[in-house]
C-alpha cells in the first residue's frame, strides 16, 4: 500500500491579514483546509482560553506531494507575494509530513474554548468535564471554516446565546463546520437548516451534527438562497465568470425563519440582502457577521434598502457583527 506524503506550507501574519491569507491558502490547499494557529491566554480555572489579539497568527495548509505540488506551491508563493506588498507577512515555511503525521498535525492547534457565558467548544479528540449550564459543542472541524477560533464565529455564538428562543425556525447560511447550527439546536431552536455551497463543508457539518446528536433538529444541505445559488464556494473568493444577477430570488423561501445566522463576507451579504429579508418572518432577526470594518457601511446600506432595521452592532478587533429585524 502506497503511503502519501504531504507538504505543509506555513506563514506568520498579523491578525488583520488572517482573512486575506486564509482565502489564498483555502483556494490551493487540500480540501480547502486552513489551520489557524492563534496565541491563547490560559484561564484561571480549567481548560478555558482567551485569544490574544495582539500577537501574530500562524496559518498552515497542506498539499499532497504529487505531480502538481510544486506548481501549486509556486502559485501560493506568487499570491502571497502580492499580499506582502500591502501587508507584512513572515517568510513562507515548508516541511514534508508522512500520512500519519499529517492526519494529526492540525489538531494540536485547537484547545477547549469557552465562548460567551455558556457555550464551550470541545475538539472531539479531547475530554472536558462540563460545568452546570454549559452548552457543549463537540467539534471536529476537519480543517473546515468555523471552529470558534475566528472572531466572526465568536461574535455569532455570543449573539446566538442571547437571541435563540425555544422552538424557533433557524437558518445557518454558510454553515462551514456546522458550529452555529449545532449551537442554535442546543440552545433550544425547534428546527435548524444549515446550508453551504461547499460540498466539503457540508460533509464535515453532517459529521459534526451527528457527533452532537442533534440530527433530529438540524438539516444540513448543499445550497444557498436565491442569488447565492450561482456563486460556488464563497469563502474561496471565486464567484464564477460573472457576478450573479441580484434580482434572481426564485429559490428563496418566503417568511420561513425566525432567526438567520449569516457568517459570510460583506460582498456576499450585500448580494443576498433581498433574499435574507424575504426569508425572514415578520419580526424575525438576522445575525450577520464576517464583516470587516471598512465594508460595514456597504452592508448597512444594502440591508436598509430592503427594509431591515438595525438593532445591534458588535465589534471584535476589525470584525463587525450586526443584528437586524424585519418589521412586523
Curated annotation (Swiss-Prot):
GO CC list: cytoplasm
Gene Ontology terms, MF aspect: protein methyltransferase activity; protein-lysine N-methyltransferase activity
One BP term from GO: methylation
UniProt keyword annotation of Transferase present: yes
Localization annotation: Cytoplasm
Pfam families according to UniProt: PrmA
EC number: 2.1.1.-
Catalysed reaction, written as an equation: L-lysyl-[protein] + 3 S-adenosyl-L-methionine = N(6),N(6),N(6)-trimethyl-L-lysyl-[protein] + 3 S-adenosyl-L-homocysteine + 3 H(+)
Keyword NAD: no
Keywords carried by this UniProt record: Cytoplasm, Methyltransferase, S-adenosyl-L-methionine, Transferase
Cystine pairs: none
Binding of S-adenosyl-L-methionine, residues: 153, 174, 196, 263
Chief location of this protein within or outside the cell: cytoplasm
Xref: HAMAP family: Methyltr_PrmA
UniProt function note: Methylates ribosomal protein L11.
Family to which the UniProt record says this protein belongs: Belongs to the methyltransferase superfamily. PrmA family.
Name of the protein: Ribosomal protein L11 methyltransferase
Species of the source: Chloroflexus aurantiacus (strain ATCC 29366 / DSM 635 / J-10-fl)
Amino acid at each position: 500500500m502506497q503511503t502519501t506524503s504531504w507538504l505543509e506550507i506555513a506563514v506568520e501574519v498579523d491578525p488583520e491579514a488572517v482573512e486575506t491569507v486564509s482565502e489564498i491558502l483555502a483556494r490551493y490547499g487540500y480540501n480547502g483546509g486552513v489551520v489557524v494557529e492563534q496565541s491563547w491566554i490560559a484561564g484561571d480555572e480549567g481548560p478555558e482560553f482567551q485569544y490574544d489579539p495582539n500577537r501574530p497568527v500562524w496559518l498552515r495548509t497542506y498539499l499532497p506531494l504529487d505531480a502538481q505540488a510544486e506548481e501549486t506551491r509556486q502559485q501560493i508563493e506568487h499570491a502571497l507575494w502580492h499580499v506582502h506588498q500591502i501587508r507584512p507577512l513572515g517568510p513562507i515555511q515548508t516541511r514534508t509530513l508522512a500520512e500519519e503525521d499529517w492526519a494529526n498535525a492540525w489538531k494540536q492547534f485547537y484547545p477547549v474554548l469557552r465562548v460567551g457565558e455558556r457555550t464551550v467548544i470541545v475538539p472531539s479528540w479531547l475530554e472536558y468535564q462540563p460545568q452546570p449550564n454549559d452548552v457543549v459543542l463537540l467539534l471536529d472541524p476537519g480543517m473546515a471554516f468555523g471552529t470558534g477560533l475566528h472572531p466572526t464565529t465568536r461574535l455569532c455564538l455570543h449573539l446566538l446565546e442571547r437571541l435563540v428562543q425555544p422552538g424557533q425556525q433557524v437558518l445557518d447560511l454558510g454553515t462551514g463546520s456546522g458550529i452555529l447550527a449545532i449551537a442554535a439546536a442546543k440552545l433550544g431552536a425547534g428546527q435548524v437548516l444549515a446550508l453551504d455551497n461547499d460540498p466539503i463543508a457540508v460533509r464535515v457539518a453532517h459529521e459534526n451534527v451527528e457527533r452532537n446528536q442533534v440530527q433530529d433538529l438540524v438539516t444540513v444541505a448543499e445550497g444557498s438562497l436565491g442569488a447565492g445559488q450561482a456563486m460556488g464556494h464563497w469563502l474561496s473568493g471565486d464567484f464564477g465568470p460573472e457576478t450573479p444577477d441580484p434580482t434572481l430570488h426564485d429559490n428563496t423561501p418566503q417568511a420561513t425563519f425566525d432567526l438567520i445566522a449569516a457568517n459570510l463576507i460583506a460582498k456576499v451579504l450585500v448580494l443576498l440582502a433581498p433574499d435574507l429579508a424575504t426569508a425572514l418572518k415578520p419580526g424575525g432577526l438576522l445575525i450577520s457577521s464576517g464583516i470587516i470594518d471598512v465594508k460595514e457601511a456597504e452592508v448597512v446600506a444594502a440591508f436598509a434598502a430592503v427594509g431591515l432595521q438595525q438593532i445591534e452592532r458588535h465589534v471584535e478587533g476589525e470584525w463587525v457583527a450586526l443584528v437586524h429585524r424585519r418589521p412586523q
